Swiss-Prot record:
GO terms for molecular function: ATP binding; UMP kinase activity. Catalyzes the reversible phosphorylation of UMP to UDP. It is found in: Cytoplasm. Transmembrane segments: none annotated. This is Uridylate kinase. UMP binds at G46, D67, T115, H116, P117, A118, H119, T120, T121. CDD domains: AAK_UMPK-PyrH-Pf. Pathway: Pyrimidine metabolism; CTP biosynthesis via de novo pathway; UDP from UMP (UMPK route): step 1/1. It is an enzyme of class 2 (transferase). It comes from Methanococcus maripaludis (strain DSM 14266 / JCM 13030 / NBRC 101832 / S2 / LL). Its main location: cytoplasm. Homohexamer. Its EC number is 2.7.4.22. The keyword Kinase applies.
Length: 225
């Protein structure tokens, strides 16, 4: 299967900082999927590094400048994952989808970060999945699925096991577009998932759920056209 993962920067690089074991466990999961014969792409987010830098820069700069800072953080996190993947990856972070596809065609795990301002790496992962005709997009993030309301501010929010892309558009449509924002799925990504009719799974970004999203029995939300 041809699978694109959006790996939240905050799961790869939690608030407490980088941990060798944590990065290694993600690298192992992606290597395992490659060994099983899957074609694997990983789009890495900017996490806390991006958010810390953006919150200071915002005092001086406009949103697209802050986005550019966020993009640099996504590429730095990408380099960290690439370092742990060793010979299974290429020591370069592509900045567009054509260069990304060349890496996949070299039979390597593709790792990339952001591309242009005004969206998050969710939108990058959805566009990459469309561009390479992937079979599955997996959004591995800091929540365990899509809820009917934002679970961070609604105690009675309910996790949805299965939704369609139109329902995803309704749920995510009102999320913020400002630099560093962190809704469960970026609204632009939802639009791309809908237009490209991409089968998508949103799971908690832990190695076990990343593996289960491809092999079955994950605990997240499945989104179908
Ligand atoms: N960002 C972009 N374009 C991209 C990827 C990221 O502008 O293609 C910026 C956004 O401000 C985003 C931040 O919130 O970098 C960190 O990425 P993410 O962790 O939110 O995906």
């Amino acid at each position: 299967m041809d699978v694109v993962f959006a790996l939240g920067g905050s799961v790869l690089m939690p608030k407490e900082g980088a941990s060798t074991e944590n990065i290694q466990n993600y690298a192992k999961a992606f290597k395992k999927l490659k060994e099983m014969g899957h074609r694997v792409s990983v789009v890495v987010g900017g996490g806390n590094t991006a958010r810390q830098y953006i919150s200071v820069a915002r005092e001086f700069a406009n949103e697209s400048f802050c986005d550019e800072i966020g993009i640099l953080a996504t590429r730095m996190n990408s380099m960290l994952l690439i370092s742990a993947l060793g010979k299974d990856a290429v020591k370069q972070v592509p900045e567009n989808f054509k260069d990304a596809e060349i890496i996949l065609n070299m039979d390597k795990i593709l790792v990339m970060g952001g591309t242009h301002p005004a969206h998050t790496t969710d939108a990058v992962s959805a566009t990459l999945a469309e561009f390479i005709d992937a079979d599955l997009l997996v959004i591995a993030t800091n929540v365990d699925g899509v809820y009917n309301k934002d679970p961070r501010c609604n105690e009675n929010a309910v996790k949805l096991d299965k939704i369609n892309t139109k329902e995803l558009l309704e749920i995510t449509g009102s999320s913020s577009m400002s630099a560093g924002s962190s809704g469960v799925v970026d609204p632009l990504a939802s639009k791309i998932i809908d237009r490209a009719k991409l089968k998508t799974i949103v799971v908690k970004g832990i190695p076990e759920e990343i593996l289960a999203s491809v092999t079955g029995n994950h605990n997240g939300t499945t989104i179908t056209p």
